[in-house]
UniProtKB/Swiss-Prot annotation:
InterPro entries: Sec_Metabolite_Reg, Transcription_factor_dom_fun. Keywords: Nucleus, Transcription, Transcription regulation. One of its GO terms (cellular component) is nucleus. It is found in: Nucleus. Probable transcription factor; part of the gene cluster 23 that mediates the biosynthesis of a family of 2-pyridones known as leporins. GO terms for biological process: DNA-templated transcription. Disruption phenotype: Does not affect the expression of the leporins cluster. One of its GO terms (molecular function) is DNA binding. It holds the Pfam family Fungal_trans. This is Probable transcription factor lepB.
C-alpha cells in the first residue's frame, strides 16, 4: 500500500480470473482490508500497449493530454511501484481512466486481441478500471489539494461513463466535479494578469503546462455549452459564463510543436493539426451558448416568440458550415481532396463525422419546437425543412462512415455522442411522419425510419446505450400509441447507479449491485424486426390522432429527452 492506494500488477487475464471475481464477491473493491483504494494495473508491456492504443484511437476525441508527459508519468509510476516508493493517487487515477477508455473503444480489428481475448473481456476491463478510477479519485479528493491530473482523469472517466450510461446523473456529476476542481485550481483565470492572481499560480507554469490547462478548460466549457442545447434536464442551462473566465483558446498545434514556437503562435484552422477539431468544437459550442442566451425558456409559449430570431440563430449554424476547412466538409469533392490530410491525420475522418453529427443534432434541436407547429404558421416550414435535413444528415453519416472507414465504422457508431444524435434524428423523422402526412411518399418515409431503427438494433451487440435508446424510443412511442417494433422484444437495461457523494463526485462506496455488470449490458442476440408485420405495425402511425396539440408533441419530445438521461 502506498499513500492509501493499494496497487497490484497483474496481467489482464490473470486479473479477470482473480481480482475481478473478488470484486464481484465483495461488492466493493475498497472494502477489502484496510486500504482506501484497492486497484490492479496491467504489467508494463500491456500498459505501454494500452497507452499506445489510446494515443492512436481515443485521445483525438478529447485532446486534453500532453502525451509525452503522460508516457513519462507512466514510466515513473511503474518504477515507483517496482521500488515500493510512494505513488500519487492522481497519477494512478489518470492511468486507470486511460486504460478504461482504451478498453471500451477497442475491437479485434483495432488490435484488441493483443491483450483481451474478446470484445466482451475488453468491456469488462473498462467497467472494472472505471470503478477503480472512481475509488482513487474519491481518495485523491480527500487526501490531496487536487491536480490537473485529477481533472484529466475525471474528464476521461466521464467519457467512459457517458458511453456506458448516457446523460445520467453520474455523468453530469463527474462533469460538474471536473469544473469545480478546475476553478479550485484557478484554471478559469489562467490568462488573467499574473499580478492579479492570488498566490504563485500561472507564473510558475511552463508554456506546455499552461497550454494543456487551456485544452482541459475549453474541453469542459465546450461540453457544458453543447449539452445546454441537447435536451434532458440540463437543457437551456449551462454552468460557465464567458464573462466569468479569462482563458485563451488553445493553440492549433500538435504536441511536438508546443515547444518549437513562441507561446503566442498558432496555425490557422485551414492547416490541419491534432487540435483543429477541438477548436472547431469550441466554435460550435459558442453558437450553442449564444442560442441558449437568445431563446426563451423551454416552458415559454412558443407561439408568441420572435421567429426571425430563430432564423438568424439557425443561419449562424449555416455560416459555421460554410467556414469549415475543406478537410472537415462532408461533400464528396472535399473528402476526395482531403485524402492526403487523412493519411497524415487519420483521426480526422472520425472527428469529421462526430462534428457533423453534433452540429446537425444541435441545429435540429433548435428548430424542433416548430416542427410540430407548421400548421400554425406557414413560415415554420423553414424550420421543418431544416429539422428534417439535419436529421437525415445525421442518419446518412452512418453510410458515409461505412464507406470511408469500412470495418472500423462499427466501433465508432457505438460512441454515445453519435448514438445520441442518431436516436434523436430518428425521433424527428417519426414525429414528422405522424404530423405531416403530405410531406412525401409515406412508404419511403416509413422505410427510412425502419432502417434507422435497424442501425440502433445492430449497435446493441456492443453498446448498452444503443439498447437503451431503442427501448426508450419504443416505450415512448407505445405510450403515445405509435408502434414501429414490438417493444417487448427489447431487453431491459439498467443504467449505472446515479448515487453521488456530498462532494458531487460519484460515491465509490457503492455495491456492484448498483453498477452495470458488463455481462448484463451486452444483450443476447435477437431481432425485433424478424417476426414483425411491417404493414400492421405502421397502421398505428396512420391512425394516430391528428388533432393532438403542439403542446402534446412537446411533451412527447420532452419524454424522449428525459428517457435518455
Amino acid at each position: 500500500m502506498s499513500n492509501g492506494v493499494s496497487v497490484r500488477v497483474l496481467a489482464v487475464q490473470q486479473a479477470l480470473e482473480t481480482e475481478f471475481s473478488l470484486v464481484e464477491a465483495s461488492g466493493n473493491p475498497s472494502s477489502v482490508g484496510s486500504c482506501v483504494a484497492r486497484v490492479w494495473l496491467p504489467p508494463k508491456n500491456e500498459a505501454t500497449w494500452l497507452l499506445k492504443r489510446y494515443a492512436e484511437d481515443v485521445t483525438y476525441l478529447h485532446h486534453i493530454l500532453h502525451l509525452p508527459s503522460v508516457r513519462q508519468q507512466m514510466e515513473d509510476l511503474y518504477k515507483q511501484l517496482s521500488l515500493g516508493l510512494r505513488i500519487e493517487p492522481c497519477h494512478v487515477a489518470l492511468i486507470l481512466s486511460i486504460f478504461a477508455s482504451t478498453a471500451y473503444t477497442l475491437t479485434p480489428l483495432t488490435g484488441g486481441d493483443a491483450v483481451f481475448t474478446n470484445e466482451q473481456t475488453a468491456v469488462k476491463c473498462a467497467f472494472l478500471w472505471s470503478k477503480m478510477a472512481l475509488d482513487v479519485l474519491e481518495h485523491s479528493s480527500r487526501s490531496t489539494p487536487g491536480s490537473i491530473e485529477d481533472i484529466q482523469a475525471t474528464i476521461i472517466l466521464s467519457f467512459v461513463i457517458f458511453n456506458f450510461e448516457g446523460f445520467t446523473m453520474r455523468f453530469r456529476a463527474l462533469s460538474a466535479s471536473a469544473l469545480t476542481m478546475a476553478r479550485d485550481l484557478s484554471l478559469h483565470r489562467l490568462d488573467a494578469r499574473p499580478d492579479r492572481l492570488p498566490g504563485p499560480h500561472a507564473p510558475l507554469d511552463s508554456d506546455i503546462g499552461r497550454e494543456i490547462k487551456r485544452r482541459v478548460w475549453w474541453h469542459m466549457v465546450s461540453t457544458d455549452w453543447i449539452l445546454a442545447l441537447s435536451g434532458g434536464p440540463q437543457e437551456g442551462t449551462y454552468l460557465m459564463h464567458p464573462a466569468h473566465m479569462r482563458v485563451n483558446y488553445p493553440r492549433n498545434l500538435d504536441d511536438r510543436d508546443l515547444d518549437r514556437y513562441n507561446p503566442q503562435y498558432s496555425r490557422p484552422l485551414s492547416q490541419p493539426t491534432a487540435m483543429t477539431y477541438t477548436l472547431l468544437r469550441i466554435q460550435l459550442a459558442d453558437i450553442c451558448r449564444s442560442a441558449i442566451d437568445a431563446l426563451p425558456p423551454p416552458f415559454s409559449d412558443w407561439g408568441e416568440v420572435n421567429y426571425d430570431r430563430f432564423i438568424s440563430l439557425d443561419q449562424r449554424f449555416e455560416a459555421f458550415i460554410r467556414s469549415l476547412p475543406v478537410f472537415f466538409r462532408l461533400d464528396e469533392a472535399s473528402r476526395h481532396q482531403s485524402r492526403d490530410v487523412e493519411h497524415q491525420y487519420p483521426q480526422i475522418i472520425v472527428q469529421r463525422y462526430i462534428l457533423w453529427s453534433t452540429l446537425q443534432g444541435r441545429r435540429s434541436k433548435l428548430n424542433q419546437p416548430f416542427l410540430t407547429r407548421v400548421s400554425m404558421n406557414p413560415r415554420y416550414q423553414y424550420s421543418r425543412k431544416v429539422c428534417l435535413q439535419s436529421a437525415r444528415c445525421v442518419i446518412e453519416l452512418k453510410a458515409l462512415m461505412d464507406h470511408d472507414m469500412a470495418s472500423l465504422a462499427s466501433a465508432h457508431v457505438r460512441l454515445a455522442t453519435f448514438l445520441h444524435n442518431y436516436f434523436l434524428a430518428t425521433a424527428v423523422l417519426v414525429m414528422d411522419l405522424c404530423l405531416n402526412k403530405e410531406g412525401g411518399s409515406s412508404e419511403d418515409r416509413r422505410q427510412e425510419i425502419v432502417d434507422a431503427c435497424r442501425v440502433l438494433q445492430e449497435a446493441e451487440a456492443t453498446s448498452p446505450m444503443a439498447s437503451r435508446f431503442l427501448k426508450s424510443l419504443m416505450d415512448i412511442l407505445q405510450k403515445y400509441q405509435i408502434q414501429v417494433l414490438p417493444a417487448t422484444t427489447v431487453p431491459d437495461v439498467r443504467p449505472l447507479s446515479a448515487n453521488t457523494g456530498a462532494s458531487g463526485v460519484p460515491d465509490p462506496n457503492l455495491s456492484d449491485r448498483d453498477l452495470v455488470n458488463p455481462s448484463q449490458i451486452l444483450p443476447s442476440t435477437y431481432d425485433p424486426l424478424e417476426n414483425a408485420n411491417i404493414d400492421d405495425l405502421w397502421q398505428n402511425f396512420i391512425n394516430l390522432d391528428q388533432n393532438c396539440s403542439p403542446g402534446s408533441w412537446d411533451h412527447l419530445f420532452s419524454a424522449l429527452d428525459s428517457r435518455i438521461v
